[in-house]
Amino acid sequence: MNHIRNFSIIAHIDHGKSTLADRIIQRCGGLADREMEAQVLDSMDIEKERGITIKAQTAALQYKARDGKVYNLNLIDTPGHVDFSYEVSRSLSACEGALLVVDASQGVEAQTVANCYTALDLGVEVLPVLNKMDLPQADPDTAKAEIEDVIGIDASEAIAISAKTGMGIDDVLEQIVAKVPAPRGKPDAPLRAMIIDSWFDSYVGVVMLVRVVDGRLQKGERFKMMASGAAYEANNLGVFTPAQQSRDALEAGEVGYIIAGIKELKAAKVGDTITLEKKLPNNLGPATEALPGFKEIQPQVFAGLYPTEANQYDALRDALEKLQLNDASLHFEPEVSQALGFGFRCGFLGLLHMEIVQERLEREFDQDLITTAPSVVYEVVKGDGEVIMVENPSKMPDQGKIQEIREPIVTVHLYMPQDYVGPVMTLANQKRGVQMNMQYHGRQVMLTYELPLGEIVLDFFDKLKSVSRGYASMDYEFKEYRPSDVVKVDILLNGEKVDALSIIVHRSQSQYRGRAVAAKMREIISRQMFDVAIQAAIGANIIARETIKALRKNVLAKCYGGDITRKRKLLEKQKAGKKRMKQIGSVEVPQEAFLAILQVED
């Protein structure tokens, strides 16, 4: 065990994490040069294109150090984005060390800070590394000062590297061997292994990536999950180098995979502990307590996904089920909307997660989708004291039956150059934010706000990028539910509610939002043969109205002079026809109308 080193890499998007991983794998001969490709560990196309890592991946590498000994290095690649923060914390807790990669030309960013704090909380040894030193605008001194200021770890011995050219890679490996502690585990205790990640393979079922903490697991042994109690047989186990390589046993301190013919990803939850099923003569039996830190992931953001053609419903369900095989944090259930027909209510970890799911559905499964406005989960206390969770505006009970509504509040860390503090604070205040803290680190400022999650999910991130010209970065974590004066605004067309257009907003903005949506609808819905009234209402109170005037045919064109009664008869006849049409005619709500809600500007 003394020759094992488990480490991961923490970095902001685009600071060169995957490139560094490629270099380390190449240096340790993990893949032959012909198998090397850019971003080896990012296996999904969308990961490569967006330059982000979504699922954790690993590589077990052999490195011959300068002291002549051979070390087993386990590189555990972590996702870097705030939506996947639970997966990050699980990946990090499987390591003893982490490389903090900072782009020497840009300095520290908010997500790096968030993940770095997670690592320090878990007691992981953090080694700072300055990447992109081959760039002319690299400024190592400022970057070092920022690391010390913001994260508070000593950066005087930060290693200068360039992952692109391969400079300094050996120094990094030597530092890992020298500074990262060997795994702390008991080889002779009952088996305990933590699931770092799991994914679905169409041939063998679920593949679990695990870190063995105590004991050992042999091929063919039966093991059980401690959270669910389900038991399976380990048909196949081994390590990734990043290519799959079978072994007979996984020992304490190692990181490897287990294949046990599990059909559903839900059975292998990230963060769960694996132990042996029962005591046999040749083993130590099950462990008594699970490893700490496991929690069920709760979706934070909900949106409706509907197929554009009604006959595509089954195809969409298949696509979602297949996606769920590889993404246990995606929740969905069927729902029916009067306006959009059959579809699904989906729950996501955050906005990036939602975008990725949508993009994968469109790209990998050729689905044409309509997405309703994203909403968050509200806690509603009904008149009789019952508490329900409402994740869909159309499910909100009537105003009269509600005692109070609580909305989710998140703590947001905003990180930006000091020139943009003003505009960013204005934006946060518009979104009902409460400032909690403000710290200066050199030229960078870190603002801490408490904001309602409902204000963030719509367009906060885009606005933040535009007011700070792209320099600000943010990360957020859920804090609590808090009573709030929010109301549901319904949109009516000719007195009929259109459920998919309902929104939940704070009372102070309800008038304004209602008017804005009604005005937007007026632009989008085409003119009919009769007047169309668009109304926004809170309960029975109408707060805004727009009217789309009818198209009109001139029935008097054929009359010439003559008696007024003749003209009046024709006009009355037209009026009666319009009235009859208005009673039976329905208004087609075009696709754009549902997206328009998202674009209603503040």
Swiss-Prot record:
Q: Which NCBIfam families match?
A: lepA, small_GTP
UniProt cross-references to PANTHER family, sorted A to Z: TRANSLATION FACTOR GUF1 HOMOLOG, CHLOROPLASTIC, TRANSLATION FACTOR GUF1-RELATED
Entry keywords, A to Z: Cell inner membrane, Cell membrane, GTP-binding, Hydrolase, Membrane, Nucleotide-binding, Protein biosynthesis
Question: What does the protein in this record do?
Answer: Required for accurate and efficient protein synthesis under certain stress conditions. May act as a fidelity factor of the translation reaction, by catalyzing a one-codon backward translocation of tRNAs on improperly translocated ribosomes. Back-translocation proceeds from a post-translocation (POST) complex to a pre-translocation (PRE) complex, thus giving elongation factor G a second chance to translocate the tRNAs correctly. Binds to ribosomes in a GTP-dependent manner.
Q: What is this protein called?
A: Elongation factor 4
Domain tr-type G: start-end pairs: 2-184
Q: Which GO terms describe its biological process?
A: positive regulation of translation
> Taxonomically, which superkingdom?
Bacteria
Q: InterPro entries under this entry? A: EF-4, EFG_III/V, EFG_V-like, EFTu-like_2, G_TR_CS, LepA_C_sf, LepA_CTD, LepA_IV
Q: Where in the cell is it found?
A: Cell inner membrane
* Family (UniProt): Belongs to the TRAFAC class translation factor GTPase superfamily. Classic translation factor GTPase family. LepA subfamily.
Q: Which residues make up the binding site for GTP?
A: D14, H15, G16, K17, S18, T19, N131, K132, M133, D134
Catalytic activity, per the record? Answer: GTP + H2O = GDP + phosphate + H(+)
Any one annotated GO CC term: plasma membrane
Signal peptide span: none
Query: Could you state a single Gene Ontology molecular function term?
Result: GTPase activity
Instruction: Please tell me the species this chain comes from.
Output: Acidovorax ebreus (strain TPSY) (Diaphorobacter sp. (strain TPSY))
SUPFAM superfamilies assigned: EF-G C-terminal domain-like, P-loop containing nucleoside triphosphate hydrolases, Translation proteins
Which Enzyme Commission numbers does its entry carry? 3.6.5.n1
Tell me the membrane topology, using the record's own terms.
Peripheral membrane protein
